[in-house]
Amino acid sequence: MNFTVGFKPLLGDAHSMDNLEKQLICPICLEMFSKPVVILPCQHNLCRKCANDVFQASNPLWQSRGSTTVSSGGRFRCPSCRHEVVLDRHGVYGLQRNLLVENIIDIYKQESSRPLHSKAEQHLMCEEHEEEKINIYCLSCEVPTCSLCKVFGAHKDCEVAPLPTIYKRQKSELSDGIAMLVAGNDRVQAVITQMEEVCQTIEDNSRRQKQLLNQRFESLCAVLEERKGELLQALAREQEEKLQRVRGLIRQYGDHLEASSKLVESAIQSMEEPQMALYLQQAKELINKVGAMSKVELAGRPEPGYESMEQFTVRVEHVAEMLRTIDFQPGASGEEEEVAPDGEEGSAGPEEERPDGP
């Protein structure tokens, strides 16, 4: 069915805007978040400038250097929940930006800049009966229509319902879907943060194992050089394979989060549509998209201990004639034995006193 459009004034919902503004206040400066907005591991948000100020206050030594920005690691506590936030070498610039909050701020500022009485309410008019407004909803055809169409027109044999009833029902359904989607986004964000930490742990463990490997090979003669290169390559391949897998998962989760955030933004904008008929023309499609997005199954996470590189530990207590058979010993921590500065092995521990294996 085709419709024509008429207009009449509509008041804005100032109460909803006030409630939204309260959710966009930074707990430090007590002002609306200023970009960039960063999300802490505890899922609270701060202006990046405010996060930097909190860090400086918690670390007087940094202030004594005359620095106004943080360029390496440190820690501070979240002002909302007191959770300790540990920074990497990038400082507060290593904290992830919350693009969803930034987008909501932009939408809020755009909406709040409009006069409350400047909007016009659109009334869809029935094309079949030009003087009749669209005021009922055909449940059989799932389209808005007018009363005369029900009495005399194409929908006289259809089941209908009042337009406000269907409007409230579908708006409630979309609102519930958005809530589920936002909750899912929070879980995805937490998983991404966890997997980024896994990447860092893999890199740290790999770096530590490489250092141990180099220290031990440096104490041996030239015959070890070829074998050392082979083992380093094996370790590097394993590191790269693990990092590629985890980073691939991060990309998948990130793509899902981006698509979900865009859908949330689109749904929020749709819910702000004050006209029931206009809203209902697009609500069904949005509801289906939100439902489908909330049911998407994401790829699994790395299994527990996936970041471990302990299987690349090397012992140097083997006899010289067996040097070319040295290989990694999975499960060995690589921390029991020490190499003396002159190249001689340190005091043997319980494992080193055992006879060499075959």
From Swiss-Prot:
Assigned GO CC terms: cytoplasm; microtubule; microtubule associated complex; Z disc
SUPFAM superfamilies: B-box zinc-binding domain, RING/U-box
SMART domains the record matches: BBOX, RING
Binding residues for Zn(2+): 126, 129, 149, 155
Coiled coil: 220-258
Chain ranges of zinc fingers (RING-type): 26-82
Region feature Mediates microtubule-binding and homooligomerization, mapped onto this chain: 168-211
Region called Disordered, residue ranges: 326-358
Gene3D superfamilies according to UniProt: 1.20.5.170, Classic Zinc Finger (3.30.160.60), Zinc/RING finger domain, C3HC4 (zinc finger) (3.30.40.10)
One annotated GO molecular function: zinc ion binding
Record-level GO BP terms: cell differentiation; innate immune response; microtubule-based process; negative regulation of microtubule depolymerization; signal transduction
ZnF locations on chain (B box-type): 121-163
Alphabetical list of CDD domains matching this protein: Bbox2_MuRF3_C-II (cd19833), RING-HC_MuRF3 (cd16761)
Domain COS: 271-329
Biased composition, class Acidic residues, residue ranges: 334-345
Keywords: Coiled coil, Cytoplasm, Cytoskeleton, Developmental protein, Differentiation, Metal-binding, Microtubule, Zinc, Zinc-finger
Tissue: Specifically expressed in heart and skeletal muscle.
Matching InterPro entries: COS_domain (IPR017903), TRIM/RBCC (IPR050143), Trim54_Bbox2_Zfn (IPR033492), TRIM54_RING-HC (IPR042752), Znf-RING_euk (IPR027370), Znf_B-box (IPR000315), Znf_RING (IPR001841), Znf_RING/FYVE/PHD (IPR013083)
Compartment(s) where it occurs, according to its Swiss-Prot or TrEMBL record: Cytoplasm, Cytoskeleton; Cytoplasm, Myofibril, Sarcomere, Z line
Main function: May bind and stabilize microtubules during myotubes formation.
Self-association state and partner proteins as the record states: Homooligomer and heterooligomer. Interacts with tubulin. Interacts with TRIM63 and probably with TRIM55.
Name of the molecule in the record: Tripartite motif-containing protein 54
